[in-house]
Curated annotation (Swiss-Prot):
It is an enzyme of class 1 (oxidoreductase). The gene is hemA2. GO terms for molecular function: glutamyl-tRNA reductase activity; NADP binding. This is Glutamyl-tRNA reductase 2. Pfam families: GlutR_dimer, GlutR_N, Shikimate_DH. It comes from Koribacter versatilis (strain Ellin345). NADP(+) binds at G186, A187, G188, K189, M190, C191. HAMAP family: Glu_tRNA_reductase. Pathway: Porphyrin-containing compound metabolism; protoporphyrin-IX biosynthesis; 5-aminolevulinate from L-glutamyl-tRNA(Glu): step 1/2.
Length: 436
């Protein structure tokens, strides 16, 4: 089981490091295809959110291949980011993916968005041909585990997300949100979720600016808000008390000089910026201005901590589910590992049987139909008796971690390695590329 994971997340790296690794949604298909075609990597997927960027893959040379890919994709030396990177392999890689999909590794434990984000990453990987059988099995099982965690525990009983935490932080700043106005820059799922929370907490007016105006109009209609063309952003954003931004832009769209103009037009009435984008939309220097308060994705952790104690018991229950599911998944993979050996053994012994029947015909001449049937039944019976013990042993061994040793032993006894070499000579080497 050669699964490997490498990445950075909110636990290991601050936002200024995570934004260095962030991959825009528009580039994700290209990056995923590059991952799967990198030498040594057999199949792979990339998850890129505001809180994590990680690659999961099956690899010949382990995380050496993954680090090589990081160097190629980002034009960096991974050693420079050693203190921020985490790596998992084999069982721990499986456990990590189950925990991520189940929201046990999220900034807000139990938040529902991460499962959708992992599913989108998986869909992208499938679309570009980067997923083959084993990674497909891993992700399919991860989604099932996530569903079981949400069904069998109360980990998601109180709806918590980055968006809801952002709104809670706004309430801490302003007290009540009644009569306040909010300007949302971006029209993604997180922005829409935040808008719902703002409306539920009494916000009076919502403005929406998006790169695609039509999408902004559709977004604003859902909340009886007002869509603003993106080219009018800087002259209209100071209408609002609260600005929530999540655009996916490669550089900050709000800088200190913008803030100075906003405060001047507002006659120094304060503005609150909630920046949930990675890379960040708001330059940190904006915080130097009196009257402007900027909170980025890492600042939200201060609010998140208030939710942690409520969920500890449920998280422990969820962790137990994940651990049990990891064992089941590994046993299933080991079972799949023995199937090719069983098939090779059956084919090998059938070849021997047919060769011996042909040799018998050469010695005895033409056989009658009745004799043919008798010889066929006799030889099949002998072969089945010969195969019974090794096949039973293989199936039993598949349930144990040491199954590889038994598989190798059976291959040696029946000379199946040489048979595989002969097949390779006849058919040629396997083709390289994604999903190979």
């Amino acid at each position: 089981m050669n699964f490997f994971v490498i990445g950075v997340n909110h636990k290991t790296a601050p936002v200024e490091v995570r934004e260095r690794f962030a991959i825009p949604e528009s580039r994700l298909p290209e990056a995923t295809k590059l991952l799967a075609s990198y030498p040594g990597i057999e199949e792979g997927m990339i998850v890129s959110t505001c809180n994590r960027v990680e690659m999961v893959a099956r690899s010949v040379n382990g995380n050496a291949d993954m680090r090589g890919f990081l160097k190629q994709l980002y034009n960096i030396d991974p050693a420079q980011y050693e203190q921020y990177l985490y790596e998992y392999r084999s069982t721990e890689a499986v456990r990590h993916m189950f925990r991520v999909a189940s929201s046990l590794d999220s900034m807000v434990v139990g938040e529902p968005q991460i499962l959708g984000q992992v599913k989108e990453a998986y869909a992208t990987a499938r679309a570009v041909g980067a997923v083959s059988s084993q990674l497909d099995a891993l992700l399919t099982r991860a989604f099932a585990v996530a569903k079981r965690v949400r069904t069998d525990t109360s980990i998601a009983s109180s709806s918590v997300s980055i968006a809801s935490v952002a709104v809670e932080l706004a309430k801490k700043i302003f007290g009540s949100l009644q009569g306040r106005s909010v300007y949302i820059v971006g029209a993604g799922k997180m922005c829409e979720l935040a808008a719902r929370h703002f409306v539920a907490h009494g916000v009076e007016k919502i403005y929406v600016a998006n790169r695609t105006y039509e999408r902004g109009v559709a977004f604003a209609k859902k909340f009886n808000g007002e869509a603003v063309p993106i080219e009018h952003l800087y002259e209209t954003v100071d209408k609002a008390d609260i600005v929530l931004s999540s655009t996916g832009a490669p550089i900050a769209i709000f800088r200190k000089e913008h803030g100075e103009k906003f405060l001047s037009r507002r006659k120094n009435r304060p503005m609150f910026f909630l920046d949930i984008a990675v890379p960040r939309d708001v330059d940190a220097k904006m915080n130097e201005l009196d009257g402007i308060f900027v909170y980025d994705i890492d600042d939200l952790q201060q609010v998140v901590h208030s939710h942690i104690s409520d969920r500890k018991d449920e998280a422990a229950h969820a962790e137990a589910i994940v651990n049990a599911e990891v064992e089941k998944f590994e046993e299933r993979l080991r079972t799949l590992d023995v199937v090719p050996t069983i098939v090779s053994l059956q084919e090998h012994l059938e070849t021997v049987r047919q060769a011996e029947i042909d040799r018998l015909r050469g010695r005895l001449g033409e056989l009658s139909p009745e004799q043919e049937m008798a010889v066929d039944a006799l030889t099949k019976g002998i072969i089945n008796k010969i195969m019974h013990t090794p096949i039973t042993t293989l199936k039993t061994a598949a349930k144990e971690p040491e199954s590889t040793t038994v598989i190798e032993l059976v291959k040696r006894i029946f000379n199946l390695h040489e048979k595989a070499k002969d097949e390779t000579v006849k058919t040629g080497p396997p083709q390289s590329g994604p999903g190979k």
